[in-house]
Amino acid sequence: MRCMGRWRRAGRVVVLDPGDRVLLLRYDEAPPAGRHWATPGGGLNPGESYAAAARRELAEETGWDDVELLGEIHRQVRLIMHDGRACRQRERLFLGRTGQVRRELGDVAAMHASDGITAWRWWTLPELDATTELIWPRGLAALIRGRLGRR
């Protein structure tokens, strides 16, 4: 999970509920990342696959271990802060589906303050299109629509 040679690998999950809303976590981090919304996920442990890391991190950050992963939908490299250092992170995003509307995630700010997570919410695709807030990955609504076969 460390930033080895200023590179880090991470798995993330784009969780959709039955209404195709996507779960995002708000991170308040030092520059270069700053305040942004992103999918649950995090760094790989030694010997761990991207998908296994995505599942583990989703469970750690939300308590959910029953989200079905439907396959990889995106790869990206982005600049993050990790352990007080800027590093490049190679990320693989997996589409996940939950069969229920989940309204409670608990106090993520208290549980994950050390990770910079300060809030969570479900976003509709039109809300993602309209927001002026920074969303990672960029173009998330289009990625989801492409996977769901929508425009």
Task: State where each predicted segment sits.
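Conserved N-terminal beta-strand and adjoining loop/helix that marks the start
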Residues: 1-23, 43-46, 90-91
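Conserved hydrophobic/aromatic beta-strand scaffold that supports enzyme active sites
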Residues: 24, 93-95, 122
